[in-house]
Amino acid sequence: MKLSCLSLALAIILLLAIVHSPNMEVKALAGPEADAIGFADAFGEADAFGEADAFGEADAFGEADAFGEADAKRSKSSSKTKPKKPKKPKKKIKIPDWVKSGGKMVGEAVAGAVADAAVSAVMDAAVGTTAEPEQ
């Protein structure tokens, strides 16, 4: 049997990856939602507790942001400041369903191809046949 231990280990690793691959989730396809603890999401929007977001804007409780600027409640005492323009609401990015389903189909196709390769490697290891170039 001329099958190396490296190819057998690779076949086992691929088989384990296929077994555990349905439990994995692609974060890029997940929407920009806050997590269960309430931290800011990936797009920097404030969480459920009103804390400052990743871009340093003031929270709902009137605290200063990360850049040291006071919010509207505290800046009223200064008469030299210019009135701030109202900010536009941030748009949430909506990923179309056809993109999500297409990514799922591609993932399943890749997992199927890897599964076929792993099964053939395991079968070759069990039977003891390997493809050798003819001389």
From Swiss-Prot:
Q: Quick check: keyword Signal in the entry?
A: yes
Taxonomic superkingdom: Eukaryota
Q: How is it modified after translation?
A: Glycosylation is critical to maintaining the aqueous solubility of this protein, but does not directly contribute to its activity.
Keyword Hydrolase attached: no
UniProt region (Disordered), positions on chain: 69-95
Q: In which tissues is it expressed?
A: Expressed by the venom gland.
Signal sequence, renumbered to the chain = 1-21
List the GO cellular component terms. Answer: extracellular region
Task: State which residues carry a glycan (glycosylated).
Answer: S120, T129, T130
Quote the biased-composition stretches of kind Basic residues, using this chain's numbering: 75-93
Predominant subcellular localization, coarse grouping: secreted
Which residues, in ranges, are excised as the propeptide?
Answer: 22-72
Q: What's a Pfam family this protein contains?
A: Pilosulin
Per its UniProt record, what InterPro entries does this chain match? Pilosulin (IPR049518)
- Where found in the cell? Secreted; Target cell membrane
Coiled-coil stretches noted in the UniProt entry, renumbered to this chain? none
Q: Which UniProt keywords apply?
A: Glycoprotein, Membrane, Neurotoxin, Secreted, Signal, Target cell membrane, Target membrane, Toxin
User: What is the stated purpose of this protein?
Assistant: Neurotoxin that triggers pain behavior and inflammation in mammals, and is paralytic and lethal to insects. Causes a time-dependent increase in cell leak current. May act by targeting membranes.
Additional notes on this entry = Very highly expressed in the venom apparatus (5%).
Similarity comment: Belongs to the formicidae venom precursor-01 superfamily.
This protein is called U-myrmeciitoxin(01)-Mg7a
